[in-house]
């Protein structure tokens, strides 16, 4: 399932790929502040940012423009007291009104569409919201996509440490050549960041 990490490399038989793949996301380039966080909770009077985990998820969902509607509901209370909930089953995602970028002018419908998606992603992974840095655990992303967004139950979380460098690059190139942008997370002693792999050269 989406929570279980793959600890044994699959046999990847394809080793020949195109020299480069242009970014699958095209011009989609989203951020964590307004308008993306317009429906994120307030904390001590300040609007919280979306968090990199939610932003990375949202860009991939926009790429697929799936689902039309979510599934179920989810709610939680964060350690800082913020209570969050989202009704996925009664939410229709307005893909057509989501812009690739939000620089310049845009309508209320366009800002509402992307803000709704960002909130849906954040709540699905129990985002710990704050005005300056919102965080969530990446291991929750896979199961959230399955449970609330209806993605394939065979979706997998894989860890770099269980693969050789060649196997890892092979896996990344395989996914990208199948036109599947990759949710990716990296961390060090100083912190971590989630982002999207959508091409290579």
Predicted regions and their residues:
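Active-site-adjacent structural segments surrounding the nucleophilic cysteine of cysteine proteases
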Residues: 1-134, 138, 188
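Active-site-adjacent substructure of cysteine-protease-like catalytic cores
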Residues: 143-201
């Amino acid at each position: 399932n989406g929570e279980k990490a793959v600890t044994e490399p699959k046999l990847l038989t394809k080793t020949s790929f195109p020299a480069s793949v242009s970014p699958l996301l095209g011009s989609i380039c989203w951020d964590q502040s307004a308008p993306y966080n317009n429906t994120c909770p307030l904390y001590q009077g300040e609007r919280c940012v979306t968090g990199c985990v939610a932003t990375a998820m949202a860009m991939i969902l926009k790429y697929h423009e799936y689902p039309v509607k979510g599934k179920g509901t989810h709610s939680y209370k964060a350690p800082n007291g913020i209570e969050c909930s989202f009704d996925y089953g009664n939410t229709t995602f307005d893909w057509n009104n989501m812009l690739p970028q939000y620089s310049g002018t845009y309508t209320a419908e366009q800002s509402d569409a992307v803000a709704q998606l960002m909130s849906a992603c954040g709540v699905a992974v129990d985002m710990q919201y704050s005005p300056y840095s919102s965080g969530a655990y990446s291991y929750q992303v896979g199961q959230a996509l399955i449970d609330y967004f209806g993605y394939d139950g065979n979706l997998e979380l894989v860890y770099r440490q269980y693969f050789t460098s060649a196997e890892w690059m092979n896996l990344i190139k395989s996914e990208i050549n199948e036109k599947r942008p990759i949710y990716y997370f990296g961390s060090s002693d100083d912190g971590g960041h989630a982002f999207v792999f959508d091409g290579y050269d």
